[in-house]
Amino acid sequence: MTSKKPAQQKRASQPRNVDKTRQYGKDWERLSHSGRYDMRRLKEAMLLLIANDAPLPPEYLDHELTGDWKGFRECHIGGDFLLIYDLRESGLIVFTRTGSHADLFE
């Protein structure tokens, strides 16, 4: 199907390639079964990161980590609900951990 939009408005960057750690999968299952966390909101943040269209909106408080987690990034899904991910130069995004501060840093 063709579009009447100018070519510039039809261009987009490719979505990022995605991977996840085994621990991330375990975190997802644990949090999903607990019923305390909005997993749909987590999926929304993940899709924004994968889409690669723009930085996450400010409400996610996306930032680089330091110390043992240097090289990783963290965003706040809501309250004390976090997503840790690794954004590599190759364009690969690896979802590494998710949970509360206590789950991830203590």
Question: Where in the sequence are the language-model features?
Answer:
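Basic, Lys/Arg-enriched alpha-helical interface segments
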Residues: 1-79, 88-93, 102-106
